[in-house]
Swiss-Prot record:
This is DNA (cytosine-5)-methyltransferase CMT2. Residues 266-279 have a biased composition (Polar residues). Involved in CpXpG DNA methylation. GO terms for molecular function: chromatin binding; DNA (cytosine-5-)-methyltransferase activity; DNA binding.
Length: 1319
């Protein structure tokens, strides 16, 4: 059995002598009184015979050195969740007003200690025992209560004092210390012994410190001021058998020993401070005892003032804990008036509770925690848009709920249940506050930022009002506040009042609140503005101002609160919380509403903004106050609508480029206790930026111009409200109704009347999958979106794009050089392009563009610049000299003699440069800022791809392959398009905590673009592959933010999205009936194609079958010549040509291996001869057989195949089957790593079959070698996915989409050409 730790403030007890009762039969470790120390101990404390029983342990404990000098055990966690304080029992304290109980709960034994019966009531003691226990002062015994051997004391000269009139020593920290010295005392060793023994008895069992903020299981409330309804008082009494009285060696009862009685007399007369926490009280007792020792012979005046006793209020489940020999808890009324009338000193005392451990006294005893109310950790914050369990109480303060990452997961219906990755328990049941799921970056200190946003301080700064109030309201409110300072104050029905400054509070003037023009009812402050004290905080009181809103008005204004009360609810007996039978979340039982509240020195009205307590060491939260209400359990709450800082959003640590004063409005609301409010803060709304630059912000603490939604990480513009209208509406709980999306139909002309054509720039275009899909979808929605410019550094991919989009200006250069070229082109246009130039001058230049000069007039020895035909930035001559170059057509020479010349060498050709710039500007050979409507592209992802084994995890931007995201955003910032579409692999959300994705989103928002992030699966839009891609949508602040299109097909999804971005997966909500077609499988796309062999080399061939499925009918119906509005011309597809239907030719060895793969579902390399599979699902060679060799002498089964994924992979040399889908289309077909063998033919899937897997029409042709074509297809965006996004873009541009992040596509969208009838 573990022994209790030694007292942290008492002198060490003397060790037992050999052979003594405490010596453990004379054990060597027990020790004894040293011969040289006997005289010293006798002089200080008395004879060992008298003192030894006091140090004896209680019955049942082991005896010896282990007990005599026990070491403090390290802190351990008890069942309540807090650290063990080193005592056998721990005090849970009392929380007033929360399920209080009048009965005294028996103490609970801590781990490692035996349970004892609770102390018998006082009235149950025999007369002798009662007299002993009810002496002049409360008796305090040491933990080690042994046999009393002291002689009987002489009879008392004074009559016994009645118990009710008996005084107790206050143990507190707030009362002033004794200033007058104690009267001198006679110097004697016995008196000195009394003082030292007093130190032992009083401080050997000090009260524990305040509950640690991390001891959430205690559920205790910190000591409160005089206004608290009840405070625990403690008396100590002997809990042993009252029939047995301990005696000394000479037969005298220990209780009546002379020294002990003197000690009790001195203890009764020692004044201690009041209203202090236990840890400070313990230290004060030490100091007082030392003072008494320093004044020899001093006598302390005894206090015998009356006190009033009351019953202790205990919260349900809280037990009074402590050693039964020393603890008996009673409750003393805290009524100030009653104590004054009785003539007694108003004291709050907690004494003789179990000793605290050294670690607690050392670490936490010196600090005083703020006096604030705490709640049990099992409580649940309720009535929130996103309800979740409360995180542990921070620093003893009330828990603050802010919905962010603690939002319940959403199951997306992308496929049948068995095909989906389970996403249950994303949050793990744990709660991460807003600066959590996402780690918040350290907030920067800005002079304009109020101190309340920074680290919490005990004195929050005083800030301005949250809103600019009307003059009429301000005047009335000022008069009301003035009256409040001198008016009368009525008592709260719950808690006794404390007079403040002996002032009174009078009635406040009537303050009308102007209602909205809708059906909202008027609420007026026509009641007496009286303060009702609710709680105590570190700065003062929290109280409601004014009487409650009348019930009928409150029900009209906040019907959702009172409808809950009228419905049938279940009651949880453990937490006294009420829940719906089918709601699945806790709700608050509201009693009444208020319109104003005061916290500390701030008066808050509904609609004002405030700081709300955040985690310890973290910035406070910011929110708007929507409701003030009291529950039927007597708790006061407020409802808050949150604002997000950039660090609080998904941007996280990538928010360095954002203004620290910029906030983001949100619809997330939560209910919190009233004392969570810290101080006021001023927040203003500013209009959205049109040119991407921040406008001047009015003088305020913060401002906001956008709204943030966790779903799909959406940043959207909100409508700028009139100040007066906003003020009128801010007093209602429906303030969110005023924060509507921008109604662009009212503020802008319809684009149908302005411009039905949009221009697109495709960066990193490849073969054109993304721009092709966007243009097809937009045209289907009624908007003519055309790709005017395309950029890629892959020359072969540029040829494929140019071949299929002849109207597009395709440039083969890097995006970095293209950005520099745009900047130089802008300078040239500003220099040479003048609007005053006549059209005739331009036309004359245009007419001579295609003419060939007369070579006979040019001397053969001279070269003359005839004209400039192109422009680029870079190093076209490969001479390691980057710069601006012009392509020169020499006079007398043809195009094949054109050369690239640097601009420095054309200083004498300003005329030619001017003509080229003017003509290029007219033909828009390069875009200028404002010329581009849509920028799309997918920055290269080799630096983050899972196939790259040399990724930079710690610093992603150190990799040159990852810097293209920066360049992409730089192009957007320069051109300022209306819409932005960026695509990337799913690994961008998995790699390095999604740093690159957060950066891209941060750049868009910093440029005042609306933004939205989503994850789309290709199989959900009519393809037999489960490739998932990330799409970042950006939109100008004055445009409609396009939604994500909902899936059209069930999909067989094999890869799940990252849990941190699970809410970004585009899918059907759980409460919406799905309208999905059956999944598309390989048979739907392959069954009509002619058979080809492994060595097929034809680039063109005819179809041998007609379309067998709806997918085949659609994919073969595109016109060969045009991809415009008439691209869906249907014709006899049997006579049409089929392009690129040839596979990658395998060498003879690999072809021999494919021949031995069976033509059945699931066949792979494990079916080859000589391979066995063990019970561990690992494929290995059969040791009993000789290894099979091919005719070339190489083994049939390669060692690299057996080592791939430790022999557990099923993909090497695998056959796909008719009813299956493929994972993704790779850039390099490799049968050794992927299942790419045709179901019925001994070959790999052809180029055309791979193109169909990506949704390319059959008339889309590719250039380059076979490997080049596979690579282009593998790098492309699936065309059906881009098509769905393009249709949603058209609906947003035409103002036909709603504000929701998702939209429903028309019926049979995947295989229909003409969709304008459904738009």
């Amino acid at each position: 059995m573990e022994t209790p730790p030694p007292d942290p403030v008492s002198p060490p007890p003397p060790a037992a002598d050999e052979g003594s009762p405490g010596g453990d039969d004379g054990a060597e470790d027990a020790g004894g009184f040293s011969a040289g120390l006997d005289s010293l101990w006798t002089a200080l404390f008395g004879s060992p015979e008298e003192l030894e029983p006091m140090w004896s342990p209680p019955r049942g404990f082991g005896v010896g050195a282990e007990f005599a000098a026990a070491e403090v055990e390290p802190e351990i966690m008890d069942v309540a969740g807090g650290p063990w304080d080193g005592a056998p029992w721990r005090s849970s304290g009392v929380v007033a007003g929360e399920g209080a109980a009048t009965a005294l709960v028996p103490p609970t034994a801590a781990a490692g200690f035996a349970e004892f019966e609770p102390a018998a009531p006082i009235d149950s003691y025999p007369a002798g025992a009662a007299a002993a226990s009810l002496g002049d002062v409360p008796e305090v015994s040491a933990l080690d209560s042994g046999v009393d051997c002291s002689p009987d004391p002489p009879p008392s000269s004074s009559p016994p004092v009645d118990f009710d009139a008996r005084g107790f020593d206050p143990v507190a920290d707030s009362a002033p210390a004794m200033e007058s010295p104690l009267p001198p005392s006679v110097a004697s060793s016995e008196a000195n012994l009394d003082g030292r023994m007093l130190d032992c008895t009083l401080n050997s069992v000090p009260s524990p410190p305040l509950a640690s903020p991390y001891e959430v299981g205690l559920g205790a409330e910190d000591p409160i001021k005089d206004s608290s309804p009840s405070v625990a008082w403690g008396t100590t009494m002997d809990a042993k058998d009252p029939e047995v009285d301990a005696t000394c060696a000479n037969g005298t009862a220990l209780r009546r020993s002379r020294r002990i009685m003197k000690i009790k007399s001195a203890a009764s007369s020692m004044p201690l401070n009041q209203n202090g926490d236990s840890s400070r009280a313990s230290k004060r007792r030490v100091a007082d005892s030392r003072k008494s020792r320093s004044s020899e012979g001093s006598k302390l005046p005894a206090f015998t003032g009356p006190i009033s006793v009351n019953t202790v209020d205990l919260i349900n489940g809280v037990k009074v804990q402590g050693l039964q020999e020393i603890v008996a808890v009673e409750n003393v009324s805290s009524s100030y008036d009653n104590n004054q009338k009785a003539g007694g000193l108003y004291n709050q005392v907690v004494v003789a509770l179990p000793a605290a451990s050294n670690s607690l006294l050392k670490d936490k005893g010196a600090s005083v925690l703020p006096r604030r109310k705490t709640r049990l950790a099992s409580k649940v914050l309720v009535n929130s848009d996103r309800v979740s369990a409360i995180s542990p109480v921070v620093n003893g303060g009330p828990p603050v709920q802010k919905s962010d990452v603690c939002i319940p997961t959403k199951k997306h219906k992308l496929a049948v249940e068995e095909c989906l990755t389970s996403l249950d328990g994303v949050d793990g049941g744990g709660i991460v506050l807003c600066n959590s799921k996402l780690k918040s970056a350290k907030s920067r200190v800005v002079s304009k930022t109020p101190q309340g946003r920074g680290r919490r301080s005990p004195q929050p700064p005083k800030t301005q009002r949250a809103r600019t109030l009307s003059v009429k309201y301000l005047e009335k409110l000022k008069r009301a506040e003035n009256n409040n300072n001198n008016g009368s104050m009525s008592k709260s029905p719950r808690v006794p009042m404390i007079p403040e400054n002996n002032g009174s509070m009078s009635k406040s003037p009537r303050v009308p609140i102007i209602p909205e023009l809708s059906t909202k009812h008027e609420l007026v402050l026509d009641k007496h503005m009286v303060d009702s004290v609710m709680l105590e905080t570190d700065d003062g009181s929290c109280f409601f101002v004014g009487d409650a809103v009348p019930d009928d008005e409150a029900r009209k204004q906040w019907p959702h609160r009172y409808e809950i009360n009228d419905q049938i609810m279940k009651k949880d007996k453990r937490t006294s919380s009420q829940t719906f039978a089918n709601a699945g979340k806790a709700v608050l039982d509201v009693k009444c509403h208020y319109l104003q509240a005061k916290v500390s020195r701030y008066t808050f009205c509904i609609g004002e903004c405030a700081f709300v307590k955040g985690p310890e060491g973290k910035p406070n939260y910011i929110g708007r106050l929507l409701e003030f209400f009291e529950t039927k359990t007597g708790e006061c709450y407020f409802r808050v609508q949150w604002f997000f800082t950039a660090e609080d959003t998904v941007i996280g640590e990538q928010a360095q480029s954002h203004d620290p004063r910029r906030l983001f409005y949100s619809d997330l609301t939560d209910d919190n206790l009233l004392d969570c409010i810290v101080s006021k803060v001023t927040i203003v709304q500013v209009p959205p930026s049109v040119d991407g630059k921040s406008k001047s912000v009015p003088s305020s603490d913060y401002y906001y111009d956008m709204k943030y939604s966790i779903d799909y990480s959406t940043f959207s513009t909100i409508e700028m409200e009139d100040t007066d209208d906003l003020m009128q509406s801010c007093y209602t709980s429906r303030i969110n109704d005023k924060m509507k999306k921008i109604d662009v139909n009212k503020k802008h002309k319809s684009p149908v009347l302005e411009k039905m054509e949009l221009s697109l720039l495709d960066l990193y275009c490849g073969c054109g999958g993304m721009s092709t899909g966007l243009c097809l979808g937009a045209r289907g929605g009624g908007v003519n979106l055309s790709a005017r410019w395309a950029i890629d550094d892959d020359e072969i991919a540029c040829e494929s794009f140019r071949n299929n989009h002849p109207e597009t200006r395709v440039r083969n250069e890097t995006t970095d050089d293209f950005l520099e070229l745009l900047k130089e082109w802008e300078k040239l246009c500003k220099t040479y392009v003048k609007h005053s130039r006549t059209k005739a001058c331009v036309d004359s230049t245009t007419e001579s563009n295609n003419e060939t000069p007369d070579c006979s007039t040019v001397p053969p020895e001279e070269f003359e610049v005839w004209k400039l035909v192109d422009i680029c930035f870079g190093d076209p001559n490969k001479v390691s000299k980057h710069g601006l170059y012009f392509k020169v057509r020499w006079k007398g020479y043809g195009p094949h003699h054109d050369t690239w010349e640097p601009v420095e060498g054309l200083r004498n050709c300003k005329e030619a440069i001017r003509d080229f710039v003017i003509e290029g500007h007219r033909q828009r050979i390069l875009p200028r800022p404002g010329d581009v409507d849509v920028v799309c592209g997918g920055p290269p992802c080799q630096g983050i791809s899972g196939y790259n084994r040399n990724r930079e995890f710690e610093a992603p931007f150190k990799c040159e392959k990852n810097k293209q995201i920066i360049v992409f955003m730089d192009v957007v910032q320069f051109l300022k398009p209306k819409y932005v579409y960026m695509e990337n692999v799913l690994d961008i959300l998995k790699f390095a905590d999604a740093t690159l994705a957060r950066y891209a989103l941060s750049r868009l928002v910093a440029m005042h673009y609306q933004a939205r992030l989503g994850i789309m699966a290709a199989g959900c839009y009519g393809l037999p592959q489960f490739r998932m891609r990330v799409f970042l949508l950006g939109c100008h602040s004055k445009e409609k933010l396009p939604p994500f299109p909902l899936p059209t097909h069930e999909a067989i999804v094999k890869n799940g999205c990252p849990l941190a971005f699970e809410r970004n997966l585009v899918g059907w909500p759980n409460d919406t009936p799905m309208q999905l077609a059956r999944p598309i499988v390989l048979e739907d796309i392959l069954s009509d194609l002619p058979e080809v062999a492994n060595g097929e080399s034809r680039d063109e061939m005819l179809y041998v079958k007609g379309p067998q499925t709806e997918f085949q009918r659609y994919i073969r119906s595109f016109n060969v010549e045009v991809h415009g509005p008439r691209a869906h011309v249907t014709k006899d597809s049997k006579s049409s040509k089929l392009y690129d239907h040839r596979p990658l030719v395998l060498d003879n060895d690999n072809y021999q291996r494919i021949l031995q793969i069976p033509k059945r579902k699931g066949a792979n390399f494990r079916d080859l001869s000589g391979v066995i599979v063990g019970p561990d699902n690992v494929a290995r060679l059969d040791p009993t057989k000789e290894r099979v060799l091919l005719p070339s002498g190489r083994p049939l089964v390669l060692d690299c195949i057996l080592a791939y994924e430790n022999g557990k992979s099923l993909r090497p040399f695998g056959r796909v089957w008719w009813d299956e889908v493929v994972g993704t289309v790779l850039t390099v077909p490799n049968a050794r790593m992927q299942a790419l063998i045709h179901p019925a033919q001994d070959r790999l899937l052809t180029i055309r079959e791979s193109a169909r897997l990506q949704g390319f029409p059959d008339n889309y042709r590719f250039r380059g070698t076979v490997k080049d074509r596979y690579r282009q297809i593998g790098n492309a965006v699936a065309v059906p996915v881009g098509r769905a996004l393009g249709y949603a873009l058209a609906m947003a541009y035409l103002k036909k989409s709603g504000d929701d992040p998702l939209m429903l596509l028309p019926p049979n969208f995947a295989f229909s050409h003409d969709l304008r009838g459904f738009a």
